[in-house]
């Protein structure tokens, strides 16, 4: 299945100067992966991976695609999140770092997310217990089996996608010529990071309406806790204090933001999404990353605070990696700085020019 996405065409066109041509419209499709085996030993006869593409593939004399870039979303997101103006308007236009006239951009929805196969499609809690390795395997099969991509110019990943980029670099080295992992650490999910995830899962499961995942009415109390924890985890406290300096302003923002977030996600999907990080740990294999890599975190990231000292130790082991820590300010966005390209687009342009 492939279809054009008219609203996204309008958004992309809005990034262009008046004299520029409108880019080729985004195209949405599904990769149906047969006999998909998960790391747990579970199997599905078919696994669907939804994807969106921008631009046109360019081929060499052998017919191989030479300009493919894959961008990977975070937990609970989809590939279409990268059409937000703070990302798309800084990167995809003429002369910008990921100009769609130059690159063939691939935006997958990962397993358990968006239009891809997920528990809420019907299997609920009997859906295979996927992990990040399964997600990367599905990405690889989508690229090679459906899109005919055997080599990527770049993998750019944010948050969960950042961790996927580290998996690609350590377990499938060389498939991507360059890596850009933003907003994560290349270490096992533990400490506070694992705790807020399991607190969310526990809250959903403790809601009497959840009924072991077989609910007919969404478990609102559990989902409310999930949305609350997510709001805190992704925020920048410096910006919130500067922008909402009174009790009334802070509470109004909280209520408005919560109203936008609450009810968007299925409870079982949320459980799976958060738990899929349980086996992630590229730490023992970091020396395998031997391609130019731009790794960026932000100092105001609640999920990946810089004081851990992990980044210094990791960067010393990755000889081709440049690590940048974006200083905290009232303008940065906490963990979500990863999607605000104005903070790092010049560094990305330098990576691509190497």
Where are these regions (language model features)?
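Active-site nucleophile elbow and catalytic-triad environment of alpha/beta-hydrolase enzymes
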Residues: 269-285
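Catalytic active-site module of serine/aspartate enzymes centered on a nucleophile-bearing elbow/loop
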Residues: 321-354
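Conserved alpha/beta-hydrolase "acid-adjacent" motif
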Residues: 302-309
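Conserved hydrolase catalytic core segment
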Residues: 150-191
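Short beta-strand/loop motif that positions the catalytic acidic residue
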Residues: 289, 295-297
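N-terminal cap/lid subdomain of alpha/beta-hydrolase-fold enzymes
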Residues: 52-120
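Alpha/beta-hydrolase-fold enzymes
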Residues: 175-260
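Conserved acidic catalytic loop of the alpha/beta-hydrolase fold
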Residues: 133-154
């Amino acid at each position: 299945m492939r279809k054009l996405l008219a609203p996204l065409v309008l958004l992309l066109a809005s990034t262009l100067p008046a004299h520029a041509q409108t880019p080729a419209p985004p195209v949405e499709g599904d990769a149906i992966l047969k006999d998909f085996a998960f790391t747990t030993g579970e199997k599905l006869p078919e696994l669907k991976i939804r994807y969106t593409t921008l631009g046109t593939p360019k081929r060499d004399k052998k017919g191989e695609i030479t300009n493919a870039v894959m961008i990977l979303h975070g937990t609970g997101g989809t590939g279409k999140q990268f059409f937000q103006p703070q990302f798309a308007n800084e990167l995809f236009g003429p002369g910008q770092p990921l100009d769609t006239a130059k690159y063939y951009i691939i935006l997958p929805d990962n397993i358990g997310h968006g239009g891809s196969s997920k528990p809420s499609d019907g299997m609920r809690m009997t859906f295979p217990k996927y992990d990040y390795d399964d997600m990367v395997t599905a990405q690889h099969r989508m690229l090679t089996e459906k899109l005919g991509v055997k080599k990527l110019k770049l993998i750019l990943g944010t948050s969960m996608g950042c961790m996927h980029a580290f998996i690609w670099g350590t377990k499938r080295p060389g498939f991507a010529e360059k890596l850009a992992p933003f907003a994560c650490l290349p270490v096992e999910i533990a400490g506070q990071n694992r705790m807020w995830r399991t607190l969310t899962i526990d809250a959903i499961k403790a809601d009497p309406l959840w009924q072991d995942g077989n609910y007919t009415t969404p478990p609102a109390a559990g989902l409310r806790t999930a949305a609350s924890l997510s709001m805190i985890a992704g925020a920048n406290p410096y910006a919130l204090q500067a922008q909402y300096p009174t009790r009334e302003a802070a509470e109004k923002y909280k209520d408005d933001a919560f109203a936008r977030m609450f009810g968007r996600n299925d409870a079982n999907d949320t459980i799976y999404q958060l738990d899929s990080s349980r086996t992630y740990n590229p730490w023992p294999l970091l020396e395998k990353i031997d391609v130019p890599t731009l790794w960026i975190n932000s100092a105001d990231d609640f999920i990946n605070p810089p004081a851990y000292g992990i980044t210094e130790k990791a960067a010393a082991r990755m000889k081709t990696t440049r690590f940048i820590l974006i200083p905290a300010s009232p303008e940065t966005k906490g963990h979500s700085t990863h999607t605000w390209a104005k903070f790092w687009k010049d560094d990305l342009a330098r990576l691509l020019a190497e």
